[in-house]
Amino acid sequence: MLFLLSPAKSLDYQTPTRVAATEPLYTRQAADLIEILRTKTPVEVAELMDLSDALAGLNVARYAAWQPQADRHNSKPAVLAFNGDVYDGLDARTLATPDLRWAQSHLVILSGLYGALRPLDALQPYRLEMGTRLANPQGPDLYAWWGDTVSDYLNERQSGEPHPVVVNLASQEYFKVVRRGVLKARVVDCVFEDWKGGVYKIISFHAKRARGLMARYAITQRIRRVADLQGFDLAGYAYAPAVSGPDRLVFRRHPAD
C-alpha cells in the first residue's frame, strides 16, 4: 500500500534535521526542467506562475542555485522541508526514526519538479506547481513532461503485491499526473468534511491538514489494509460509512455543542 501526498509551497530550511537524506529518483529530469526555468526572466516567471515580483525573484535565484548533486548544505529531506497545511498535520519532525523509515517505504510525495519523491529524498528549494503550463520538449505542460513516469514508478514500487493499493491524499492538480490507464493499483480516495452552515462540506484548509493527519495515522499505525483506515479518528474526525464507498472513504467532523 502506498500513500500519495501533494507537496507544499512553503518551505522550511531553518529548522535543523537529524536524519540523513536519500537521493531523489528523477534528478536528471529535474535538472532538465531547471535548465528550462533558467531561460525565464523574473517577469516571465511571475506571469507563468502568477507570483509577485518578490516571489518571482526569489525563485529565479533558486533555479540559479539548484545543483544536480544535492548535499547537506543545499538540501533537506523533503518531508521535513515542506511546510504547509498538509505537513502541519503530518508533523514529521515529531516522528520517530522507525516511523520515518516506514514512511520512506510507503509514502510518495508528488512534485512538479521531481516527479515523485520519497519522504527522505534530498529537496533543494524550488517552486514549480504541477499545474504550471511550462512548455517543454514533451509538450505544453508538466503532465506531458512526466508522461507515464510517475504511474510506472508506482507500479514498480508495488510489483510484488498481489493486491496493490494507492491511497490518494493528494490534490486533484497533483493526482492528475498519475495516469489511471497505466496504474495497475486500486485507488482509494479519502475525503474529509466539516459541518458548516447546516451541511457537511469540504473546507480546503481543514481538508489539507486532515490529509496530513491521515498520512501520520497510517505511518504510526503501520496501516496495510484499506479497512484499517476506517479507524482514523484524529482531530475529531470519524469514518462515515453511510456516505462512503469501497474506494471513497469519507470522514466527517461535527463541532462539539
Curated annotation (Swiss-Prot):
One of its GO terms (biological process) is response to hydroperoxide. GO terms for cellular component: cytosol. It comes from the Bacteria. Pfam families: H2O2_YaaD. Belongs to the UPF0246 family. This is UPF0246 protein Lcho_2652. It comes from Leptothrix cholodnii (strain ATCC 51168 / LMG 8142 / SP-6).
